[in-house]
């Protein structure tokens, strides 16, 4: 048996996931509550969730979840999006005030469909076009960040403990057939809203503990 100091376990995060193989919908309150017993495996520098099947009314559209530092940035980004997409719906993502979740950016979502004329001109399929668009915004548009971009799914994340982040985003009002959750415990990096897990691109979302 190894003694104290001979074992190093670098992972310190909290994770949870639930999926219905039958495709039955589950409230986001379930996954939020699942994170509560793991409170001490996070340190409040990042919590997040991803839900699948949560946008049945817009299931054929890409749901862009975005952070903006200021209104002018959002307007500039929206003008950019209108050049590339049909924007079917644009709205602020509903939240509730939570004392432990502070300094929130502007949190917005767009339900969009790539313009066929743009796809034809660029000779790209939808997925490659989406990846390039998300990458361009996140690397070139200061103050704008796409943190979720799939169909009929969405990531929700913030600086805070995951159970508080779930309440902040009102996940109890969503229903999905699959949920993942993560609580960060960074020891050498700062917490920022875009850096919380899950990391999402198209329909994929990633959480990890190391």
Predicted feature residues:
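Extreme N-terminus nucleophile/cap motif
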Residues: 1-61, 120-155
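Extended, highly charged
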Residues: 54-177, 181
């Amino acid at each position: 048996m190894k003694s104290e100091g001979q074992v190093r376990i670098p992972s310190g995060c909290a994770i949870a996931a639930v999926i219905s193989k039958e495709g039955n919908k589950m409230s986001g309150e379930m996954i939020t509550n699942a994170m509560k017993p793991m409170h001490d495996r996070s340190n409040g520098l990042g919590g997040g969730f991803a839900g699948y099947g949560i946008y049945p009314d817009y299931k054929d559209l890409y749901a862009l979840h975005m952070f903006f530092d200021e209104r002018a940035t959002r307007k500039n980004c929206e003008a950019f999006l209108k050049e590339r997409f049909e924007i079917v719906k644009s709205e602020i993502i509903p939240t509730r005030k939570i004392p432990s979740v502070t300094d929130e950016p502007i949190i917005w979502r767009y339900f969009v469909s790539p313009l066929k004329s743009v796809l034809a001109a660029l000779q790209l399929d939808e997925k490659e076009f989406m990846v390039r668009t998300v990458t361009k915004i996140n690397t070139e548009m200061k103050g704008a960040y796409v943190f979720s971009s799939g169909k009929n799914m969405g990531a929700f994340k913030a600086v805070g403990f995951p159970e508080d982040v779930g309440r902040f985003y009102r996940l109890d009002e969503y229903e999905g057939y699959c949920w993942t959750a993560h609580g960060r415990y960074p020891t050498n990096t700062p917490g920022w809203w875009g850096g919380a897990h899950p990391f999402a691109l198209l329909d994929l979302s990633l959480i990890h503990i190391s």
